[in-house]
């Protein structure tokens, strides 16, 4: 597996470098995803180690982190947006890229390849596809946590009104700073909102807070809290009726979740 890991890592570096361009608008998005890929790969490995997985499974987690956003590069180069609703689902696109362009998938054991595809396919969905396979669920949860933890880092510079204009086409800079009523309602209830309905900068911020309820491991949530991501997002929420109830519920949930010891059942 060590040799295969090295070949996959080298392939991914070469693949990402194909999208380097003199077009600074495109390059802004490509650069963000190149850096994000490195962070998520490292986080996935660290979380797998925290969960005391086997060396083989730690390496699988690494591979999943490495390839989880491979579809983003083709997506952004074509559509100049990371908005799946305005282009293509980037996880599904990533699986196409791996099938069409990555020559080492067949070197994985069939069960490992299925795990990889399942985790990547589900890393960006509202919920994980139902399955009785505990290993698939574990790796999907692990990858979702690793991805979310780093996306918090990515988005922090774009929270302020001044930062909005610098964001690489997440949402049009002229969009409202307020939160849409459906998102306020979901926040107050502690439920996930439909990402496809994102319309405003306020919606985008609130969705990141709602992610807290979808974090699977207390290790991840503790990292999110320790790095100040939750407090910073709350700081830059609009002064809007209905949000206080959601903030109170969120803080109570975080306190309880962070105190739970991570356990896995495979």
Spell out what each predicted region is.
Residues 1-92, 133:
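Acidic/His-rich, divalent-metal-binding segments that scaffold phosphate/diphosphate chemistry
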Residues 2-3, 29-38, 42, 46-54, ...:
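Divalent metal-dependent phosphate-bond-processing catalytic cores, especially two-metal-ion Mg2+/Mn2+ enzymes
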Residues 16-21, 52, 74-77, 102-109, ...:
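Short low-complexity stretches enriched in small and charged residues
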Residues 53-66, 110-119, 136-142:
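Alpha-helical scaffolds flanking conserved acidic
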Residues 73-115, 126:
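Hydrophobic/aromatic-rich structural module bridging two neighboring secondary-structure elements via a short loop
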